[in-house]
Amino acid sequence: MTEHKSGFVSIIGRPNVGKSTFVNRVIGHKIAIMSDKAQTTRNKIQGVMTRDDAQIIFIDTPGIHKPKHKLGDYMMKVAKNTLSEIDAIMFMVNANEEIGRGDEYIIEMLKNVKTPVFLVLNKIDLVHPDELMPKIEEYQSYMDFTEIVPISALEGLNVDHFIDVLKTYLPEGPKYYPDDQISDHPEQFVVGEIIREKILHLTSEEIPHAIGVNVDRMVKESEDRVHIEATIYVERGSQKGIVIGKGGKKLKEVGKRARRDIEMLLGSKVYLELWVKVQRDWRNKVNFIRQIGYVEDQD
């Protein structure tokens, strides 16, 4: 009988290297928020990938960066704590970018862990094959990685091969989650993240990190209809105007795009109501951050 592998794998890397894209690719559902703006992942989003011979729980950590506020402190704490809780580490980098100080900072952290560390060079669809080997050799000069695998999370290139390699390093173990469970976050959290993703796609650079979303109410009204009420929090009145848009057009578009994805997630029709409120300097208010679900209760 074939042995069954199971384990927890942390995905770590600088902001915007494609960690969320990878999680969504291997899970087959949108679990982690995707945006072209850095530092958009705020919690350890666990995506559960179940195959006949293995179950891998991916922990998509917030991108490593120097904290600028209480929320940033929390994001960094989550990223570092994750390294001590898992069976393998994916260090993801952009194959089409130079090694930066952020990468060097992470490598120094990784040198001190006993867990297997896989270097995953993402976005190989954006580089010429001749440029790949020199990049790999450059990373090898920093530390000895357990394995080095180039992939494109967006295009799906080499992703299955990486999963096969990863499985060989995981311990034998049971399924921790049922076959049909794809995340350990409650549905309300994922719904809030979908709404936040749409706002990030539709607003300008000044908005992203000032956005928080709380799902106030989520009720199944019938077999095929769910009623959701959510509040979008910003830090300034001017940001509220940007999110709402002229004549409410921007907010309507956010709702339209979010509703489409939420209906796919829940498998039923969704009636979505959105409000925008100003909560000044909310990213520095620990109690408020906890209230909207971005901080786990910790001792």
UniProtKB/Swiss-Prot annotation:
Domain KH type-2: 203-280
Region entry G3, spans: 60-63
Main location: cytoplasm
PROSITE patterns, per database record: G_ERA, KH_TYPE_2
Keyword Cytoplasm: yes
Superkingdom of origin: Bacteria
InterPro entries: G_ERA_dom (IPR030388), GTP-bd (IPR006073), GTPase_Era-like (IPR005662), KH_dom-like_a/b (IPR015946), KH_dom_type_2 (IPR004044), KH_sf_prok-type (IPR009019), P-loop_NTPase (IPR027417), Small_GTP-bd (IPR005225)
Residue ranges, annotated region (G1): 13-20
Protein name: GTPase Era
Protein source organism: Staphylococcus aureus (strain NCTC 8325 / PS 47)
